[in-house]
Amino acid sequence: CLNDERFFCSLEQFRHWASRYQTLRMEYFYREMRKQTGYLMQGQQPFGEQWNYDSANRKAWAGNPPLPAPLHFEHDQIDLDVLELVEREFSRNSGSLDNFRWATTRSNALLALEHFIIHSLPHFGDYQDAMVQDSDILFHSLLSPYLNCGLLLPREVCNAAEAAYHASHAPLNAVEGFIRQILGWREYVRGIYWLYMPEYANRNALQYSAPLPQFYWTGHTRMNCMAECFRNTFQHAYAHHIQRLMVTGNFALLTGIDPQQISEWYLAVYADAYEWVELPNTLGMVMHADLSLIHISEPTRRTPIS
């Protein structure tokens, strides 16, 4: 079969890598992909003599540096026709069309990449784990929908990030952290999905069976962190990885929600949610339902490419 340009690692290559290990640890896979692609490498050694700068990426954001202005795109006639159709046919569904700001063409997706590299990447590393009331995006890229549907290719995105580092426009912890989400985590969960499906979808190691609360669909709850995540989700079809994992996901884990029900919710509400990426993140990282198949050495577990 033809290789998919939306990924660095073929399924055959991932199967070969997985056959060499009893524990499929993402960090080992990521280092191998760094060596294979040459990103942030000097020969066989990483820039800065360190593979992973996650420990430098957990600062709280208190108002400085200022947040970049959001990027907006003009709607073409196709956009307007589709928005009208959705409003007509699905007006009772969760979500809102009032703040639709996604690129729907490759040219606009490239503008979104450029905007992120210039305005947000320099601070992405420091604040990628931060949560701030009423600040929905912070310095996140919003590129995952374009990568997953093919409007952007991972190689051009990683090339742009690495070029920013070489031009001294963005620090190593930001560029490494961003590239790791694409070259490491995104490739890793895709490999896990295809290696273990279709049986993987039914895993429920903790035997959780509680129904998904209705407020996951309405957003109506007195729990402020949950309400903020729902507001962001329904306004933008987006939430960054800490909101998904540490807030809406952690609540599902602590209350024993059926993994299939929370998986269906994530798949329904996010613009970047395709089953190959959503399912391993939900079953493995959120619900611990996959018999501890997914292994990550970082103390903070995350959803890729926010």
Label each region the model flagged.
Residues I294-I305:
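Single conserved hydrophobic/aromatic residue that forms the stacking wall/gate
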Residues G256-Q260:
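Structural helix-adjacent loops and short alpha-helical linkers that scaffold large soluble proteins
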Residues R15-H16, S263-Y266:
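"Short basic amphipathic alpha-helical interaction patches in structured regions
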Residues C1-W102:
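Beta-rich, aromatic/charged-enriched effector core domains that present basic-aromatic interfaces
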Residues T248-A252:
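Alpha-helical support elements that line or immediately flank enzyme active sites
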Residues N57-A237, L253-L254, W265-A289:
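Catalytic cores of enzymes that engage adenine nucleotides and/or redox cofactors via long glycine-rich
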Residues H241-I242:
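Generic helix N-cap/helix-start motif at coil->alpha-helix transitions
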